[in-house]
Design a protein with these regions (language model features):
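Transmembrane beta-strands of outer-membrane beta-barrel pores
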Residues: 3-7, 29-35, 53-55, 68-74, ...
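Feature captures outer-membrane beta-barrel proteins of Gram-negative bacteria and organelles
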Residues: 11-26, 45-55, 152-153
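Transmembrane beta-barrel architecture of outer-membrane proteins
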Residues: 8-10, 44-48, 93-97, 147-149
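Flexible, solvent-exposed loop segments that connect beta-strands
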Residues: 30-44, 72-94, 123-143
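Membrane-embedded beta-strand positions of outer-membrane beta-barrel proteins
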Residues: 1, 15, 27-29, 49, ...
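Mid-chain, structured segments of secreted extracytoplasmic proteins
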Residues: 40-77
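Repeated loop/turn-to-beta-strand initiation elements of outer-membrane beta-barrel proteins
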Residues: 22-25, 59, 108-112
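Outer-membrane beta-barrel "beta-signal"
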Residues: 144-159
Length: 159
C-alpha cells in the first residue's frame, strides 16, 4: 500500500508477481469516494500496471520499470488549493512512463519501497463552476509531460 496516497485520504493496494528471473509485473489501484463538507470533492479511481526489471535479485535493491496509468477523477471546491475553491474538474487521465525505485527488505514478510517516475499523461475533462449549480464552463484536453509516479509503499509478502 502506498503511504503517500493514504496521505490524501485515498485507500489503495497493489499486487506484484514474478514473471521471469529478472522481471516482475505489478498492478496498483486506488479509489477515493469520500464526501467532504461544502461540496468539496476528491473522488477518483486509478489503475497503474507496471513491468519491472531487477538487475540483481527480485524484490531487493534497485529496479527500473515501465508503467501505464488510467484514472477517472471528480475533484474540486478544495479551499486550500489556489484556483480550485469554486471549480470542479471531472474527467479521464491516461498515459505512461518510466520508473526508478528501490526496495528495502525489513524481514521475512515486510519491506519498504520508494519509487519515482516520469512520463506522459493525457487529460480530457469538463470544468464546472460549482457543484450545486452544475454550470459547465467547457470541455478541455491537455497533454502533460513530467512526474507521473511517486510513492513510498509498505509491503507484505504472501508466500
Amino acid at each position: 500500500t502506498d503511504l503517500l496516497l493514504w496521505g490524501t485520504t485515498t485507500p489503495n493496494a497493489g499486487v506484484e508477481t514474478s514473471v521471469s528471473r529478472h522481471f516482475t509485473m505489478a498492478l496498483n489501484g486506488a479509489y477515493n469516494a469520500w464526501k467532504f463538507g461544502n461540496d468539496m470533492k476528491l473522488n477518483l479511481y486509478l489503475i497503474q500496471p507496471e513491468l519491472r526489471y531487477w538487475p540483481c535479485r527480485k524484490f531487493e535493491g534497485h529496479f527500473l520499470g515501465v508503467h501505464g496509468h488510467y484514472a477517472y477523477y471528480n475533484v474540486g471546491q478544495i479551499p486550500f488549493f489556489s484556483g480550485m475553491e469554486d471549480i470542479i474538474y471531472r474527467g479521464d487521465l491516461y498515459g505512461g512512463g518510466i520508473t526508478y525505485g528501490y526496495h528495502w527488505v525489513l524481514g521475512d514478510r515486510f519491506s519498504i519501497e520508494a519509487v519515482i517516475g516520469g512520463g506522459y499523461a493525457r487529460m480530457e475533462y469538463d470544468k464546472y463552476r460549482c457543484a450545486g449549480c452544475g454550470e459547465r464552463m467547457g470541455h478541455y484536453k491537455r497533454n502533460y509531460f513530467g512526474p507521473t509516479r511517486a510513492g513510498v509503499s509498505l509491503i507484505y509478502f504472501i508466500r
